[in-house]
Amino acid sequence: MSSPPLHGLSSVGHLSRDPPPRSWSPRDKCSYLGLSHGNLRVHYKGHGKTSKDAASVRSTHPIPAACGIFYFEVKIISKGRDGYMGIGLSTQGVNLNRLPGWDKHSYGYHGDDGHSFCSSGTGQPYGPTFTTGDVIGCCVNLIDNTCFYTKNGHSLGIAFTDLPPNLYPTVGLQTPGEVVDANFGQSPFVFDIEDYIREWRSKIQAQIERFPVAGEWQSMIQRMVSSYLVHHGYCSTAEAFAKSTDQTVQEELASIKNRQRIQKLVLSGRMGEAIETTQQLYPSLLERNPNLLFTLKVRQFIEMVNGTDSEVRCLGNRSLKSPDGCLGSDSNCSNGIISNKAHQTHCHSKSQSSNLNVTELNSINMTMSHQLNSYSSNDVEMETDHYSNGFSASTSNGFLNGSSRHEPELEECDTEMEVDTSHGRRQLCGGSQAAVERMICFGRELQAMSEQLRRERGKNATNKNMLKDAFSLLAYSDPWNSPVGYQLDPIQREHVCSSLNSAILDIHNLPKQPPLSLALEQASQCLEMMAQCGIGSCAFARVADYLH
């Protein structure tokens, strides 16, 4: 006996968007039938004197084509007085005051005579009769549109061919005392359907492997692989692959290394350095893409909260070494990421580093809550002594750079995030008071940038929600374990990294997406379209199976 849960669809229904049949429908049945046991048991409660007393019930949903193969079983709890029972399929709208198989688009296998009924009141000899204790299975193959039955685990052969789409499992009873239980995969099946599924999976995969391709397919695939390596900045691998396949790399190696450097900065959470490096290597890129710059800046704010952005990490380092912290020093932080001028403009206080207490954290929350409330208003007036034309006075190109224009050697600020050992959890901005103050100043600058974008380019719901979600992190004493804490997950950096990488490639007239990824996406979309069109073979064609 096979025992996978929800067996009829669990292994082949990966493309199905529609729910599969899981029980009988209390709203799609004849009144002569009663349901119980989670709508899986059906009992007859009519008079049962003539064929006009027959009654059927359909499942809650039709069988989705995307499942490929669907199987269910019905156990005869009691054959009742005469055992006039039918098990089969029907489309929506078929008369339920009849046994399955008697009407058009209705198909059934009957227990009293063992005949199969295909849209007709006249049956054809098919299999043995069935009675109390027997288990009858019905398998619908949506690849070749056939149906076969099983009895007590043994196949009885094909019963119906050329089946229409959107069929519902159906059972019908006609005489008093008849009771049956359905199994739509909630329990182990008597018949080993897995072997049948494996057989058809092998057939479909063999068809795919035998599909003819053009003679240049190998060189085409090599070019796609090469472009994929170049796109993601795998410089050494791309160079080695190009040599081994006698190709030329589409992009200069220096350019690939530059993109790789920027990607590493983004994926490590060092957003300030990533923005600075991008502006140095591609001076006009972010100026021409203000929404991209805004996205990068919002991510930088999130990394400040996380304590991973270079700016706050450097402040944390310096404040541990100096009682005045970075804010009071005359020097800038590494790579010019934080400038003394910006501090003088926005942050006038000097604070020693300390773990944040509850009072301080509440103050931060109130400050940023005020920022959120201001942002929600359409008539926000920024403080003129802090901003010029809606932006920080430290900016040079209309948008805040978050960095100095100098280019000193990169100074690594790789200290681990501070942990509040008294509470056993992470601290805002690594626990540095100076870093928290800089984060608040940066948040104000970010809000100013948002207002400027809205004035110049109109409302942007994506930008507004992005900023609101980022600011919402400060509404919680432990943002990592808050409803918006997902933003602090390193995996959230990947989308930002991809957007920036695509923009850089675009200025080099290279594809924003690698052809290999587009081909895989096209294959996935084709499979989904096959499922929508009722082509059952799509159930056995997974793109992932060919990526190993």
UniProtKB/Swiss-Prot annotation:
Signal peptide: none annotated. Transmembrane segments: none annotated. GO terms for biological process: cytoskeleton organization. Residues 1-23 are annotated as: Disordered. Residues 255-312 form the CTLH domain. Keywords: Cell membrane, Cytoplasm, Membrane, Nucleus. GO terms for cellular component: cytoplasm; nucleus; plasma membrane. Residues 217-249 form the LisH domain. It is a peripheral membrane protein. It is found in: Cytoplasm; Cell membrane; Nucleus. It holds the Pfam family CTLH. May act as scaffolding protein, and as adapter protein to couple membrane receptors to intracellular signaling pathways. Acts as a mediator of cell spreading and actin cytoskeleton rearrangement. Core component of the CTLH E3 ubiquitin-protein ligase complex that mediates ubiquitination and subsequent proteasomal degradation of target proteins. Belongs to the RANBP9/10 family. This is Ran-binding protein 9. It comes from Xenopus laevis. The lineage of its organism: Eukaryota, Metazoa, Chordata, Craniata, Vertebrata.
